[in-house]
């Protein structure tokens, strides 16, 4: 049985679990309930009306957070030849080909985003078990498999706060919005960008209610239920 400490118990007293809060109210409440000694991450969890086993109902995409994630993002690029030089010029923190792949196989994982040129993917593919489970595998659908001329744009987006979202096996999307230390308006604008991207990425096979429930929470805090009408209204901005 999971037990919670006094700080959590005090925090949850602020929450009325029978209420579905407007996004701005939910953010304010989540910030007030953030009682950890570190700067907690603020996350949103959406239960989608999608079947993860249905090929026509897969959801995957990218959102760029206008206020970033509140951390320094290290970008790695798999490239060789002229493309490797382009990665350096574009500002990648780590870049390379075969030797970089060997380095990762040996345990190197000091990066937050991985990008690859299309021609490198046949080699990068063997890192699937290492990178896939950490959400670091380059993927064309998430815009991280690109030609060298797109490196600068993708790297800049990653540093600004480029976040990927994907439907998990339970039909839920988990996505980071920023840090509890962010001002409420910053988190609200990040949330708006995320919801808009998710609505714009609605699969062609989706049927019925697209978003079934939405919750906001900090790393150590309780979940705050969001008003679905208000959340859905964020789409199409």
Curated annotation (Swiss-Prot):
It holds the Pfam family Ribosomal_L1. One of its GO terms (biological process) is translation. InterPro entries: Ribosom_uL1_bac-type (IPR005878), Ribosomal_uL1 (IPR002143), Ribosomal_uL1-like (IPR023674), Ribosomal_uL1/biogenesis (IPR028364), Ribosomal_uL1_3-a/b-sand (IPR016095), Ribosomal_uL1_CS (IPR023673). The keyword Ribosomal protein applies. Keywords: Repressor, Ribonucleoprotein, Ribosomal protein, RNA-binding, rRNA-binding, Translation regulation, tRNA-binding. GO terms for cellular component: large ribosomal subunit. The keyword Hydrolase does not apply. GO terms for molecular function: rRNA binding; structural constituent of ribosome; tRNA binding. SUPFAM superfamilies: Ribosomal protein L1. Belongs to the universal ribosomal protein uL1 family. Part of the 50S ribosomal subunit. PANTHER family: 54S RIBOSOMAL PROTEIN L1, MITOCHONDRIAL, LARGE RIBOSOMAL SUBUNIT PROTEIN UL1M. Binds directly to 23S rRNA. The L1 stalk is quite mobile in the ribosome, and is involved in E site tRNA release. Protein L1 is also a translational repressor protein, it controls the translation of the L11 operon by binding to its mRNA. HAMAP family: Ribosomal_uL1_B (MF_01318_B). This is Large ribosomal subunit protein uL1. It comes from Dehalococcoides mccartyi (strain CBDB1).
């Amino acid at each position: 049985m999971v037990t919670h400490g006094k700080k959590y118990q005090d925090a949850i007293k602020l929450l009325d679990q029978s209420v579905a809060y407007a996004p701005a109210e939910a953010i304010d409440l989540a910030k007030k309930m953030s009682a950890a000694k570190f700067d907690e991450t603020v996350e949103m969890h959406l239960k989608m009306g999608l079947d993860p086993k249905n090929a026509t109902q897969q959801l995957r995409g990218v959102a760029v957070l206008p206020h970033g994630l509140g951390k320094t993002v290290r970008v790695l690029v798999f490239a060789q030849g002229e493309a490797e030089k382009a990665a350096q010029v574009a500002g990648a923190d780590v870049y390379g080909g075969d030797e970089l792949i060997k380095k990762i196989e040996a345990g190197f994982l000091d990066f937050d985003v991985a990008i690859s040129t299309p021609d490198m993917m046949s080699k990068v593919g063997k890192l699937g078990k290492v990178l896939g489970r950490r959400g670091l595998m380059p993927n064309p659908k998430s815009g991280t498999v690109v030609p060298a001329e797109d490196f600068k744009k993708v790297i800049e987006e990653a540093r600004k706060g480029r976040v990927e979202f994907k439907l998990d096996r339970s039909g839920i999307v988990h996505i980071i919005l920023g840090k509890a230390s962010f001002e409420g308006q910053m988190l609200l604008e990040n949330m708006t960008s995320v919801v808009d991207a998710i609505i714009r990425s609605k699969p062609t096979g989706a049927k019925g209610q697209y978003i079934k429930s939405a919750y906001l929470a900090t790393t150590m805090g309780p979940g705050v239920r969001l008003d679905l009408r208000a959340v859905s209204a964020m789409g199409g901005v």
